[in-house]
Amino acid sequence: YWQRLFAPNLKIHPEFVAFHQKNYGTASYQDFVQQFKAELFKPEDWARIFEEAGAKYVVLTSKHHEGFTLWPSAQSWNWNAVDVGPHRDLAGDLAKAVKARNLRMGFYYSLYEWFNPVYKSDVQRYVTERMLPQMKDLVTRYEPDVLWTDGEWDHPAKTWQSEAFLAWLFNESKVKDQIVVNDRWGNDTKGQHGSFRTSEYGQGAASNSQRPWEECRGMGESFGYNRNENLEMYQSGEQLVH
């Protein structure tokens, strides 16, 4: 939403601007955090449903491309779920509930951020002072079984310092003997490196791979709730599995 609303280089989706102005006036995207309370979030219920559905592991989006973190990241001061909005460690609460059910817990983490001024002006400073400390903090705090990175496409793995981070992860971190990672560590790594390959809405045909793979998609045509989607747009359970 923020990208379509704000990105000056994307001269598409003017309906986003019209919708926003009609419903929210001059409010900024950041103002939405005041409405984000998560008052109905019950991680124990989520974990129970995951288990009853037959899931073996859970991956939560800890930070997407807008940079907001669901844990109290020191590098995301005043733009995380503890400092503002719910005032709650959503990532930690879900991790605790999932592990209590003996399920594997994982985190999605976006390497890049759409409008972070440091990322836009000095990528290496962003990687060194924000991205790497955040990923190490996430791993050290919650000891996940899966680290699912994304947003790698702007730069090769060398720029993201992926090799150095993975060396730490698999040699020094608390989860070095148990964690698995996906293949999105640079625009030169997808399908080539990682514990498993990832495709997205069928792109890349990872199912043809001899290596472990995971298909990344929503149940419908969106990754989140979209009130414009009807039931016909949703995949059946059999379609999602096969």
Where are these regions (language model features)?
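Mature catalytic domains of secreted/periplasmic carbohydrate-active enzymes
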Residues: Y1-H242
